[in-house]
């Protein structure tokens, strides 16, 4: 096995980044600007995981500019991210992408997208700015301490005989995705939280094809309000994704109770003033028509004047306290995972492992995951910047 020592630049450091995803590539871009010799390792196509983000439009960030308020959108990592976001905020993200040649706009829901509405375009802009970064299409098998640096053993993805290659680096940045294998770190005593699906649709015991595709706007679960989509397997959409993130480590089955119309409804008054209307026509002002029969059955077809107090209360209970039993997640839908390197192992001011000098961790490699809306990419950009700053300051 040939041992290749990467040439040190004027900075006195040469850096390996393992994982050519969002965080790894941006970290490489920032480090090359500082004059470092940077090598990216990934067995697949760089930035391939960026392509499906934001429905293919690439939701770069969220227009939340206070770092503490921004951090509230991460079920795992909120306090850890205070320091990170105070150093690299949403403002900094906009400036970064302007520098990369990516123009942006903010939607009414505060999500920030490229004006091209194309993740492919963003990918191309980032890669075009990595002119001085070497990209190795190799799978890293092992990292070992070697003198004052690190030895990386990797297998070329294109090699039929799987010949092992060895490299020497002064610094290593772990920026792999949450679905990746952490076995290459087995020589280091690091606590790693096994990945679980996050931001994923939920399979429920209660299923009905007749309501598949129905969306309830601004439904509420335990103080969280967002749109809820009913599907053939259960529930999906923004509210379901938030719940899946919060409850990523809960055991199945578990129950959820939804308020489908959080605003108070004076149903008795509506029944009294519309005595000859069917109940479904009265309720359709508050919830989608296609959901009413599923919730209350044949009561939907009864005239308002025939509804007694007990039936009225039953209707209200279905509107304000719909109970669903979650039995699993929708396999193959997840794009984000809960899990990764335990945050107790990381210095939040530098992204460096506390036990091992000159090894840094960023992005989804960390046990950090956020809600839908650009939050996970914000974590990728911000932690990449903090790692770059730490290496620059101490090199």
Question: What kind of feature is each model-predicted range?
Answer:
Residues 21-22, 45, 179, 366:
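Residue-level detector of alpha-helix initiation sites
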Residues 66-68, 86, 92-110, 171-175, ...:
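Residue-level recognition of phosphate/Mg2+-coordinating polar/acidic sites
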Residues 48-131, 139, 288:
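Conserved N-terminal/central alpha/beta ligand/cofactor-binding core
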Residues 176-183, 367-394:
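A conserved FAD-binding loop/helix module that cradles the flavin
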Residues 16, 32-55:
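Glycine-rich FAD pyrophosphate-binding loop
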Residues 120-121, 126-288:
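Predominantly flavin-linked oxidoreductase catalytic cores and closely associated redox partners
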Residues 1-12:
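A short, basic/flexible loop-to-alpha-helix module at the beginning of a structural domain
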Residues 10-23:
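Beta1/beta-strand and adjacent pyrophosphate-binding region of the FAD-binding site
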């Amino acid at each position: 096995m040939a041992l290749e020592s990467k040439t040190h630049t004027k900075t006195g450091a040469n850096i390996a980044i393992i994982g050519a995803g969002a965080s790894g590539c941006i970290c490489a871009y920032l480090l090359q600007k500082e004059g470092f010799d940077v090598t990216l390792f990934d067995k697949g196509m760089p930035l391939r995981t960026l392509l499906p983000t934001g429905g293919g439009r690439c939701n770069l960030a969220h227009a939340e500019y206070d770092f503490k308020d921004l951090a509230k959108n991460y079920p795992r990592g909120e306090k850890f991210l205070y320091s990170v976001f105070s150093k690299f905020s949403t403002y900094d993200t906009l400036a970064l992408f302007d520098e990369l040649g990516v123009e942006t706009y903010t939607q009414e829901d505060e999500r920030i997208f490229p004006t091209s509405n194309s993740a492919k375009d963003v990918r191309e802009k980032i890669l075009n700015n990595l002119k001085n970064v070497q990209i190795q299409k190799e799978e890293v098998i092992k990292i070992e301490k070697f003198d004052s640096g690190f030895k990386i053993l990797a297998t070329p993805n294109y090699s039929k005989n799987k010949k092992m290659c060895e490299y020497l680096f002064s610094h290593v940045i772990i920026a792999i995705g949450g679905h990746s294998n952490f076995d290459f770190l087995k020589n280091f005593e690091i606590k790693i939280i096994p990945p679980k699906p996050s931001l994923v649709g939920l399979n429920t015991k209660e299923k009905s094809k007749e309501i598949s595709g129905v969306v309830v706007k601004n439904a509420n679960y335990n103080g969280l309000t967002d749109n809820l989509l009913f599907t053939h397997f259960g529930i999906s959409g923004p509210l379901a994704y938030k719940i899946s993130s919060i409850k990523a480590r809960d055991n199945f089955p578990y129950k959820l109770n939804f308020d489908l119309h959080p605003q108070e409804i004076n149903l008795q008054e509506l029944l009294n003033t519309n005595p000859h209307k069917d109940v479904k026509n009265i309720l359709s002002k508050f919830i989608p028509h296609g959901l009413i029969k599923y919730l209350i059955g044949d009561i939907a077809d009864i005239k308002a004047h025939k509804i007694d107090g007990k039936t009225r209360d039953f209707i209200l209970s279905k509107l304000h306290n719909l109970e669903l039993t979650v039995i699993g997640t929708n396999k193959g839908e997840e794009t984000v995972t809960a899990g990764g390197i335990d945050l107790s192992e990381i210095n939040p001011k530098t992204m460096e492992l506390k036990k091992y000098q000159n090894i840094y961790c960023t992005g989804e490699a960390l046990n950090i995951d956020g809600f839908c809306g650009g939050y996970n990419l914000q974590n990728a950009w911000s932690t990449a910047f903090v790692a770059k700053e730490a290496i620059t300051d101490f090199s």
